[in-house]
Every structure is written in C-alpha cells, then in structure tokens.
Regions:
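Amphipathic alpha-helical dimerization/coiled-coil segments
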Residues: 1-7, 79-95
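N-terminal helix-turn-helix DNA-binding core of bacterial DNA-binding proteins
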Residues: 2, 6-46, 66-78
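Short alpha-helical linear motifs
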Residues: 48-51, 90
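Alpha-helical residues within the helix-turn-helix
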Residues: 39, 50, 56-57
Length: 95
C-alpha cells in the first residue's frame, strides 16, 4: 500500500503543473498534433517539448508521427480516470 501511495503522490505531483494540465485537458478530448497543443498552451516549442517529455516518461501520453508532425494521445492507465474527472470538473464547457 505504501508503494502505491508513493507512486500516486509522484504522479499527482508531476501532473500538478498548469501547463501540463492544459495539455492533458485538451488530450482528454482526443489526439492532438503538437502545433495545436502549442496554440492551446501558449508555450514555446521548447517548453512544450519539456512538459511532453515528463508526461511520456510517466507513461501518461504516447506519440504517433504523421509525416513531420507528432500527434499526442492519452494512454490507458491509472492517470486516465483522474484526468477525466479533472476535465469534467474544470475543462468541460459550463452548462
């Protein structure tokens, strides 16, 4: 149980960055190319690349290359449910 709690805390700490949350909020809606993620976040290409590397290392996102463009998507896993709940609470259009 302690190991699971430590892993969960590490994951949540890594997700707890506003720029990463903006990326993930967009990816909950479906796959997106890097230029779109850059537009959504307002980050430079370099900064976005660093944030995406953190998410790849956590096995939260995966990539697919189409010509010269990388597309990102969320992976199934423990983080997905958390991200879907956050999206519903904070990112989804208000009704």
């Amino acid at each position: 149980m302690a190991a699971h709690a430590a892993h969960a805390a590490s994951l949540l700490k890594s997700l707890a960055h506003p720029a990463r949350l903006r990326v993930l909020c967009r990816l909950v809606e479906g796959e997106a190319p890097v230029p779109e993620l850059q537009a959504v976040t307002g980050l430079s290409a370099s900064a976005l690349s660093q944030h995406l590397a953190v998410l790849r290392n956590l096995d939260v996102v995966a990539t697919r290359r189409q010509a010269q463009t990388l597309h990102y998507r969320l992976l199934e896993g423990p983080a997905l449910g958390v991200l879907q709940a956050l999206h519903a609470a904070y990112c989804a259009p208000q009704r």
